[in-house]
Each structure stands twice: as C-alpha cells, then as structure tokens.
C-alpha cells in the first residue's frame, strides 16, 4: 500500500491496513499469528535476558 501510494501519510495507511485486518477470518490471520509466535520464540532463545525498555 505504501509503495502504491508513496505520498500517503503513515497514519492513513495504518488505518486502512487495520480495517483490512479486521475483515480477515481467523483462518486467514493464522499464518501471521503463527509466524509471530515463531519469531517471538526465536528472539527469546537468542536474547534470553532481553527486557523491553522504552
């Protein structure tokens, strides 16, 4: 979406993507959730003492 509309503000892109995400079924969302879990586990393994500090 950002590549198709390079002048579009990031907040507008985020709102549109959020709206599209809400329209997806749980089955369509599952691959993304599974990948997030895999990456989270990999990060925990590589950086066991990591603490989020904003």
UniProtKB/Swiss-Prot annotation:
GO terms for molecular function: DNA-binding transcription activator activity, RNA polymerase II-specific; RNA polymerase II cis-regulatory region sequence-specific DNA binding. Residues 1-51 bind DNA. InterPro entries: HMG_box_dom, HMG_box_dom_sf, SRY-related_HMG-box_TF-like. One of its GO terms (biological process) is brain development. Keywords: DNA-binding, Nucleus. It is found in: Nucleus. One of its GO terms (cellular component) is nucleus. It holds the Pfam family HMG_box. This is SRY-related protein AMA1. It comes from Alligator mississippiensis (American alligator).
């Amino acid at each position: 979406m950002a590549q198709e509309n390079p002048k579009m503000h990031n907040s507008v892109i985020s709102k549109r993507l959020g709206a599209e995400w809400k329209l997806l079924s749980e089955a369509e969302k599952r691959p993304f959730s599974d990948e997030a879990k895999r990456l989270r586990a990999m990060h925990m393994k590589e950086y066991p003492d990591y603490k989020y500090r904003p």
